[in-house]
Swiss-Prot record:
Keyword terms of this UniProt record: Cytoplasm, Methyltransferase, S-adenosyl-L-methionine, Transferase
Catalytic machinery residues: 75
Official protein name in the record: Protein-L-isoaspartate O-methyltransferase
GO MF annotation, one: protein-L-isoaspartate (D-aspartate) O-methyltransferase activity
Length: 225
């Protein structure tokens, strides 16, 4: 897969947001075990500094989570890359993201040419993410709703990426996973979470694998404007 992205000159970045700095981040991700070249190319192409507050732009290409308001964060780049790499292994066409947040994970998936549907419970975050998608020329379908419900009208999905942690995998989301599809989600409570990969086999059987220890904000129900 080749990233498809239209960057305006002002989006390219300078200094601590320059392409050179993005390239260094990609090399750190490679050294940390990310192997999929399409994922690395998407991380190199999508300007993470556009998805955070301007005051934090100089930290955009650190391998760390950063605050985006409303008690939420933009995920650590390694985690975004690992989740993306995991779902790409099943060669998906249509992906559901639960928890749009800043829009960065959805943008990475869209840059890979995938058909992306994303759901966010916090209206203000979704409005900002939509502006970023438009600015980058990305056709990401988005919805303001309770992410735990998913978006069943457009299912089933070849891949589902959940960007907030629940104590257990949410049945309503698993039910929207296509045969041969893969769901990647953080599972656990505030003190201990694991990134879990769930794959639905051709016979409908579910196979589960733990990928890594992680720390995510909680997956909450309901909606906020």
């Amino acid at each position: 897969m080749t990233p498809r992205l239209r960057l305006q000159p002002e989006s390219v970045g300078i200094g601590m947001t320059s392409q050179r700095v993005r390239d260094r981040l990609v090399e750190r991700l490679r050294e940390a075990g990310i192997q999929d070249e399409a994922t690395l190319n998407a991380m190199r192409t999508v300007p993470r500094h556009l998805f955070i507050d301007e005051a934090l732009a100089s930290r955009a290409y650190e391998d760390t989570a950063l605050p985006i308001g409303h008690g939420q964060t933009i995920s650590q780049p390694w985690v975004v890359a690992r989740m993306t790499e995991a779902v790409l292994q099943v060669t998906p066409a249509k992906v559901l993201e639960v928890g749009t947040g800043s829009g960065y994970q959805g943008a990475i998936l869209a840059a890979l040419g995938l058909e992306v549907y994303t759901v966010e419970r916090i209206g203000d975050l979704l409005r900002q993410a939509r502006k970023r998608f438009r600015h980058l020329g990305m056709n990401v379908r988005s919805k303001h709703d309770d992410g735990r419900i998913g978006w069943p009208e457009h299912g089933p999905y070849d891949a589902i990426v959940v960007t907030a942690a629940a104590p257990a995998l949410v049945d309503a989301l698993v039910d929207q996973l296509a045969v041969g599809g893969r769901l990647v989600a953080p599972v656990g409570g505030p003190s201990s979470q694991s990134l879990v990969q769930l794959t639905r086999g051709a016979d409908g059987a579910i196979e589960q694998q733990v990928l890594a220890p992680v720390t995510f904000v909680p997956l909450l129900s309901g909606m906020l404007d």
